[in-house]
């Protein structure tokens, strides 16, 4: 996956371990871009922020609510510039949705439905019972990072780690930040007051094949041209 970048920037230093990069280049870099697996986002981001480096971290920002709260506190205490890689937030479509709603062009919004075709990787699986040979191109210990060190299995790589709770956040964690961003921003939603969830068979190691989540958000302060009532 990195070959195109390596070919374009042949003189750039390359590292397997982000910690070694921080040790060797910490004094010569201003910021970092983090696009590793979900379960390593928080620890790499936290180390960078503690060093005073600005951070652009791919979505989902973290692997858990605790990690998100930790990074929020670090951002406030360090004062570094941070951004999450939610590319749709920078597009014209998001701005147009906000403009339409804030101008009252579609009236009060009381219900929003969002859907995705994800997962496009396997989910709803039991944990593998056997170990496979680790590919020569993969440092399994480094990939595992802060997660539990499971025996390597081909079900995890490439790409499919997204459906396994030790490494990924399932379809909801992978896509909700994209498809829910517009209503969150346009309707000025905060924290929900009620959350209900249902899914196909729940397993301890892997995300379900399908799920439905319902959230209720309280009314917000009205805007000049539109009211912001409770939203489902």
Residue ranges and their predicted role:
Residues 42, 46, 69, 91-95, ...:
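A structural signal for well-ordered alpha-helical segments within the folded catalytic domains
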Residues 141-228:
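Rossmann-like dinucleotide-binding domain that binds NAD(P)(H)
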Residues 1-57, 62, 66-81:
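N-terminal glycine-/serine-/threonine-rich beta1-alpha1-beta2 phosphate-ribose binding loop
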Residues 2-4, 121-123, 151-153:
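Short, solvent-exposed loop/turn elements at domain surfaces
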Residues 13, 33, 110-113, 144, ...:
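Residues embedded in well-ordered beta-strands within globular domains across many folds
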Residues 54-56, 61-142:
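A contiguous active-site-proximal alpha/beta segment in oxidoreductase catalytic domains
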């Amino acid at each position: 996956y990195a070959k195109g970048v390596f070919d374009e920037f042949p003189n750039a230093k390359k590292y397997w371990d982000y910690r070694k990069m921080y040790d060797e280049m910490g004094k010569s870099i201003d910021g970092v871009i983090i696009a590793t697996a979900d379960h390593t986002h928080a620890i790499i981001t936290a180390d960078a922020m503690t060093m005073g480096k600005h951070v652009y971290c791919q979505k989902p920002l973290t692997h858990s609510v605790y990690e998100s709260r930790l990074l929020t506190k670090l951002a406030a205490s360090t004062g570094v510039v941070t951004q999450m890689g939610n590319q749709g937030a920078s597009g014209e479509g998001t701005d147009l949705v906000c403009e339409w709603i804030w101008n009252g062009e579609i009236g009060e919004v009381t219900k929003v439905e969002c859907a995705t075709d994800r997962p496009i990787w396997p989910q709803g699986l039991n944990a593998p019972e056997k170990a496979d040979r680790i590919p020569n191109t993969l440092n399994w210990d480094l990939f595992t990072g802060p997660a539990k060190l499971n025996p390597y299995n081909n079900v995890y790589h490439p790409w499919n780690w997204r459906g396994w709770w030790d490494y990924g956040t399932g379809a909801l964690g992978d896509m909700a930040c994209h498809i829910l961003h517009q209503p969150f921003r346009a309707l000025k939603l905060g924290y929900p007051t009620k959350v209900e969830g249902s899914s196909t068979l729940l397993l301890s190691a892997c995300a379900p094949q399908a799920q439905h989540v319902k959230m209720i958000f309280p009314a917000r302060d009205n805007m000049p041209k539109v009211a912001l009532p409770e939203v489902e």
